[in-house]
């Protein structure tokens, strides 16, 4: 931007030629005996028009003239708005970002100075409970699409100066703000430096989803499993920060990205901290059991029925033989049809309006399953096994992990269909080998089981009482490993 209002106005009109909502006004303003030419620039859809009228009121302009447009601190102290000095050499990208963030640009001709006044009124959504992470005893406020609001939800829970916040602008066109939060005296500095470097290296024209950031920072390693967790609950995000993890908040996304994570972390839920520890442990074990059932039950059943019927008890075998009488498809094809059918119902339930989604998944499955049995297309035993497998996936909150279970279910089922129990065992080995090679910001995905960290195995598997949670997870290599000090520790 040049040093005269006329040149600035012409440049700005070229920059925003196709933006009819950007208003550029050249006005002469008189206060006392002084007259100056003022250039006002703003975007009408992201500002508060009431504040706009107040910002250019005679009283404020009089203060500007009295300060000779040189003392921005005096200007800010006399104004009820947030006033900062505008560098006239700012690039198109910087000026665009300021305008579309809701700032009013004021440029004075005689004094060759400019200011920005924050009069933003951006479209926002009120804070409400997360739809995917329901709670009974926990807090009912959830993240929204506004970055500053989300940071405030975390700040009000962590009232400490050790909570560091780094901000990055990513996307040449979207100029999206990405916030990195961590406890500087707890989190591993090596991990923080790694994620900071990866965020700075991102060079993309636009960011519209936090999933884009996740893919950039996790690298190019092939993984069927998600290497990052997400949550819509601030209380759970704070709990992760206290454990030594970091959080990414993306402007426009109502979820927080959490890393580093390992496999046991995905069976934890935000509600675990509000349960009695025995029930919380039971829920975690149930989730682990649900994961195993979801992946392996259909494959194991089809291998048993197709290749090893001699291992089935005679009473059950007789029942299965009667139920399969008249079925036109072999067991593997029958199972594949039912798995695909249930997946279609589940995906349809996720995409139609919430009021009908639950009904479609449950009632639709019952009606279609019963109709398939009555018509003789599938056997009742196969419907039961596939239904149990699909329902078991709902023990998890993370939809990315749920999608992984669906893919693995297909893989295990196909190998078991072709090779029987041998294929079933080989599929288990392949999954274990794949998982053992995964890393989330240096953290092994099977930690603390492989490599073994015995002090963290029990807390990762069970929800132990808070009185026993004296140390942070050792596998995270935190700077401060102590969570709870006893009276004896304080006296030392």
Swiss-Prot record:
Top-rank taxon, per record: Bacteria
Keyword Transmembrane applies: yes
Keywords carried by this UniProt record: Cell membrane, Germination, Membrane, Plasmid, Transmembrane, Transmembrane helix, Virulence
GO CC field: plasma membrane
Disulfide bridge partners, by residue number: none
Membrane topology: Multi-pass membrane protein
InterPro entries: Spore_Ger, UPF0353/GerABKA_families
Positions in coiled-coil regions: none
Biological-process GO terms, alphabetical: spore germination
Compartments, record wording: Cell membrane
Stored PANTHER family: LEUCINE ZIPPER PROTEIN 4, SPORE GERMINATION PROTEIN
Physiological role: May allow B.anthracis to germinate within phagocytic cells and therefore involved in virulence.
Family statement drawn from the similarity comment of this UniProt entry: Belongs to the GerABKA family.
Record protein name field: Spore germination protein XA
Organism for this UniProt entry: Bacillus anthracis
């Amino acid at each position: 931007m040049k040093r005269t209002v006329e040149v600035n106005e012409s440049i700005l009109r070229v920059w925003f030629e196709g933006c009819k909502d950007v208003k550029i006004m050249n006005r002469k303003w008189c206060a006392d005996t002084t007259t100056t030419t003022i250039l006002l620039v703003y975007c009408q859809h992201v500002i508060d028009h009431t504040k706009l009228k107040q910002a250019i009121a005679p009283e404020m302009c009089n203060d500007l003239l009295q300060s000779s447009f040189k003392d921005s601190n005096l200007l800010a102290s006399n104004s009820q708005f947030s006033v900062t000095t505008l560098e006239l050499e700012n690039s198109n990208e910087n000026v665009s970002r300021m305008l579309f963030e809701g700032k009013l640009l004021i440029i004075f001709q005689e004094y060759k100075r400019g200011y920005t006044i924050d009069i933003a009124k951006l479209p926002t959504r009120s804070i409400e409970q997360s739809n995917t992470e329901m709670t009974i005893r926990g807090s009912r406020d959830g993240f929204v699409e506004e970055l500053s609001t989300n940071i405030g939800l975390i700040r009000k829970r962590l009232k400490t100066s050790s909570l560091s916040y780094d901000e990055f602008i990513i996307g040449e066109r979207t100029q999206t703000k990405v916030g990195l939060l961590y406890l500087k005296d707890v989190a591993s500095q090596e991990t923080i430096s790694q994620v900071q470097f990866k965020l700075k290296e991102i060079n993309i024209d636009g960011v519209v989803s936090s999933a884009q950031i996740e893919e950039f920072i996790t690298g190019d390693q092939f993984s069927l499993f998600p290497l990052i967790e997400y949550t819509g609950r601030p209380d759970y995000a704070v709990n992760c920060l206290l454990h030594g993890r970091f959080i990414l908040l993306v402007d426009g996304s109502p979820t927080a990205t959490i890393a580093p994570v390992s496999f046991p972390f995905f069976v934890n839920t935000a509600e675990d901290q509000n349960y009695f520890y025995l029930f919380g442990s039971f829920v975690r074990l149930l989730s682990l059991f649900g994961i195993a059932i979801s992946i392996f039950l259909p494959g194991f059943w089809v291998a048993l029925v197709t290749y090893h019927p001699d291992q089935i008890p005679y009473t059950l075998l007789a029942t299965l033989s009667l139920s399969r009488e008249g079925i036109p498809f072999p067991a593997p094809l029958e199972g594949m049809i039912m798995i695909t059918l249930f997946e279609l119902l589940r995906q349809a339930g996720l995409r139609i309006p919430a009021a009908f989604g639950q009904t479609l998944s449950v009632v639709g499955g019952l009606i279609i399953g019963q109709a398939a049995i009555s018509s003789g297309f599938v056997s009742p035993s196969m419907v039961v096994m596939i239904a149990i497998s699909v329902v078991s996936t709902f023990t998890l909150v993370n939809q990315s992990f749920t999608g992984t279970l669906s893919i693995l279910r297909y893989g295990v089922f196909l190998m078991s269909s072709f090779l029987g129990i041998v294929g079933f065992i080989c599929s288990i080995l392949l999954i274990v080998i794949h998982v053992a090679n995964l890393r989330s910001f240096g953290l092994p995905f099977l930690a603390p089981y492989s490599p073994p960290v015995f002090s963290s195995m029990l807390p990762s598997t069970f929800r132990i009482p808070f009185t026993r949670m004296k140390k942070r997870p050792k596998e995270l290599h935190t700077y401060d490993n102590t969570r709870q000090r006893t009276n004896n520790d304080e006296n030392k």
